[in-house]
Amino acid sequence: MAQAPTRTRKKVKKTVSDGIAHIYATFNNTIVTITDRQGNTLSWATSGGSGFRGSRKSTPFAAQVAAERAGTAAQEYGLKNLEVLVRGPGPGRESAVRALNNAGFKILNISDITPIPHNGCRPPKKRRV
């Protein structure tokens, strides 16, 4: 018996008007993730994934390129407004926020959510160069 042709449905892209940009800036890399209000990931990009390797990964320019790539991918969902959450002490913090602003997003507020220990784990020893 011949099988009936299965119809493939075209996946409908959801439209989101406002979302959250999570910027995780470490000393070695910068990760930019753009989510909707519920926390579902719409797009993401990293400095390392944007073509920067080694010490160039931890530069503000690499963070700017990563934020631009995540922003252009998120604009396909119709994203207009962003709430920015910045975490970590890295050099790409401000440049990533500036790149999202220049990409055409209206930034509603910027929050620093860097975890600060209440005297928890012992920190790494100081570098001697």
From Swiss-Prot:
One GO MF term attached to the UniProt entry: structural constituent of ribosome
A Gene Ontology BP annotation from the UniProt entry: translation
Record's GO cellular component terms: ribonucleoprotein complex; ribosome
SUPFAM superfamilies to which the protein is assigned, alphabetical: Translational machinery components
Domain of life: Bacteria
Keywords, comma-separated and alphabetical: Ribonucleoprotein, Ribosomal protein, RNA-binding, rRNA-binding
Subunit structure: Part of the 30S ribosomal subunit. Interacts with proteins S7 and S18. Binds to IF-3.
Cross-referenced NCBIfam families: PRK05309.1, uS11_bact
HAMAP family named among the record's database cross-references: Ribosomal_uS11
Similarity section: Belongs to the universal ribosomal protein uS11 family.
Role noted for this protein: Located on the platform of the 30S subunit, it bridges several disparate RNA helices of the 16S rRNA. Forms part of the Shine-Dalgarno cleft in the 70S ribosome.
UniProt-recorded name of the protein: Small ribosomal subunit protein uS11
Organism: Thioalkalivibrio sulfidiphilus (strain HL-EbGR7)
